[in-house]
Amino acid sequence: QALARGAKPIMWSPVERTALAEAEVEYHDRKVPVVWVKFGIDFNAKPIRSRGDFLEISELVNAKVVIWTTTPWTIPANQAVSFNPNITYVAYEVEEVATEAELGFAPYAAVGDRLVLAENLASDVMSSAKVKRFKPLGTVDPHGWTLEHPLYHVGDFFQHAIPMLAGDHVTADAGTGFVHTAPAHGEDDFNVWLATDHTAQEIRQIVDADGRYTDDVPEPLKGLDIIVTSGKKRGEAGKANNEVIRLLAESGNLLGRGITTIRDAHSWRSKGPGSRRATPQSFIARDKPVHAGKTLRELAMKAISDTEFFPPTGRNRLSAMVESRPDWLISRQRNWGVPITLFVNTKGEPHTAALPKDQADKLNANIKAAIEKTGVDGWFATPLESFFEGTGVSAEGWEKVTDVLDVWFDSGTTHAFALRKRGIIDNATGQADVYMEGSDQHGGWFQSSLLESCATRGMAPYKQVVTHGMVVDAEGKKMSKSIGNTIEPDEFQKQHGIEILRLWTASADYWDDTRISDEIIKGTIETYRKLRNTLRYLLGALDGFTPEESLLSAHPREGGDPVRPEAPAFAGESGVESMPGLERFILHRLAELDSEVRAAFQVFDFKRVMTAIVNFVNVELSAVYFDIRKDALYCDPSFATSKAWDEETSVHGNRRRAVRTVMAAVMERLLCWLAPVMPFTTDEAFGESHLKGSAPSVHLLLFPETPAGWRDAALAARWEKIFRVRRVVTGALEVERREKRIGASLEAAPDVIISDKALIDAFAGEDAADLFITSGAVLVQAASGPAGAFALDDTPGIWVVPRLAPGIKCRRSWKYFDPATAMPGFPDITPRDALAVKAWDGAAG
């Protein structure tokens, strides 16, 4: 019902000799000629009424209606002049014009000229025509006027009546208040022509497919091109404009001329200007019922409202296009493509609409059989009569359409043959999860897919639409080989590797145009190196890690450990509650991060994913957690070697076990979260990790579930207080290191003065020296610190007095300790280190 054939002014590319869809049109600034043209009033055509306060007929003798156009080549196709009944029109008489000596050329206007213009535009028009002084004669009513063609003198072809047509598309914002109307070359012109009791058959087609005047147009215009279609000047203005302007001047109907810049339609392929041209084409009507009594426009607008868009602005853009778009032009005039398998009768009706359903079905079956036998060439090669055999319809009076389908129509059917036909989604109600393409596809693939699916199924083919911008250079300029600012993906891959390109994409605001340059890529490489090194560090730290070691997967021992029967049971060995506060804080952050990463992935916000992960790696892992827990990781008794299970050894052994448990949880989540962005790196790390036996590839793992019990807001608040103090201590130690008063932070044992008791209370149960990575630390509450104490302006109420750590340096952990506390047989290492060595020696036999 919605498929129709008809002649309409559609965008045409003379360079390519084909119609253009809206999606194939781009707009560029172009300098064009502008002319003001006079149309004489034909008083003999039919009586002109005088009424009310309007001028008498006698006062309009020799008056001419003025139009303005930037397409002089369309003047030969003029068939009417349009006006708006709501605009006030006035007849003026020219009293003085600029002289040739003043201008350097002879003006086209002359004293005594009578010109009809919109009242509020008269001054601008007169100025453009170099008129110095003019006077109003009175208001006029153009209803019923008939005009003479401005090329009347060229020959009989132009000696036809030019009616005045009332139309709402005429405005008084610019121009003259009258609109030159060539229904073959303008959509508004076409519509007002049909709306005023004229027919499409009366429209003059004087420009051929090559953009040249046809042989119907008299000399000297016949055969002139409106656009150069070949050679070095391809796409430039042809000879038609200049010749039309010359003829207008010769006839005395040129009032003024100039040059202006307009935003003009160009073919996105050839880059040449397009022009509107009325030709027989195939259309899908937007406002006729196509499914369940709903029009295509109604169905599409409803489908858009039911679809998720990322970014959300995509909905507004697509809605605006669908809401305002005219009927869908689906035919093209090319030597290749999918044929439009229609026959049209002498009325221009397609067989699908003109024939009874049973006959149309038989004809369609013959078409299908021919194409199945020999391919799409079967449509063109099979004689017309053969298609009509056995249909009960005579082939006489029918013509085969040789146009091909718009390629956007082809692409818009991908959901049908790529998903529905293959059974991936339900044929009637199935939808693709997501369509992703560039922002230019709101007028292309997104829209053609939407319209095709709505027309056939009444619904969108997708649940979600994701739009990305284009890649631009560091200055925001579009990449162009002529400018030399392009980056070739092949060369990029050879130099940096494809993971860097993926990481750059995921880290950028890809919804908008995205900048890329060597400097930007350097930053991406640093980010990649940091992430890769973090995974490498975790691989080393987790060497030999097994599920039995995990405090999250083990169970509290009842009467002994099945893995190590000799180990006694003790309460709280398993589970989050058994872990030190710092480990529980990292698990809390993993739980927070898990929610954020999942939510961001859900809405395709990859930058948010990467920002959250990179900040976590840089700030909380590398700068804090890994730094603090190096001592426990390197020096605490290990799970595998602990044999001496007295209480102290258990505590130290459990801490290292907790560290490795948390690192394993971090490793698993980082691998899974980063896998979509860094597939090679994560799969390589997965193959070397403790997880390698759990799946053939990291890409076959689901995101691990993160227990709600890991979240602990109160604990997180406590650790935020600890980190605030630690930041000031770290700053003080950096000064000491810079001044060479210490070499490493373990040489220090600072005094920390804190005014807020809540900050001191936050350290309850924690070893401040471990957290500061010093050999000792004293926390003191006081209203202020001593003179000369280190402080940070942005962290008031905390002061640090650096002091050297007393005692001797542990040969194993490098911590300073009181030698009097050393265990027998281990005089030069701390008691903790002595326990670790004993455990190691015991395990070694």
Map each language-model feature to its residues.
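Residue patterns forming the tRNA-binding/recognition surfaces of aminoacyl-tRNA synthetases
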Residues: 2-76, 96, 141-146, 152-157, ...
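Amphipathic alpha-helical
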Residues: 2-30, 124-133, 142, 148, ...
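Acidic, turn-prone loop/beta-hairpin segments
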Residues: 10, 14, 18-28, 346, ...
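Alpha-helical recognition segments enriched in aromatics with Gly/Pro capping
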Residues: 38, 43, 156, 168, ...
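Protease-associated
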Residues: 80, 87-178, 187, 191
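Secondary-structure capping and boundary motifs in well-ordered enzyme cores
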Residues: 314, 396-408, 426-444, 484, ...
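Cysteine-rich micro-motifs
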Residues: 824-836
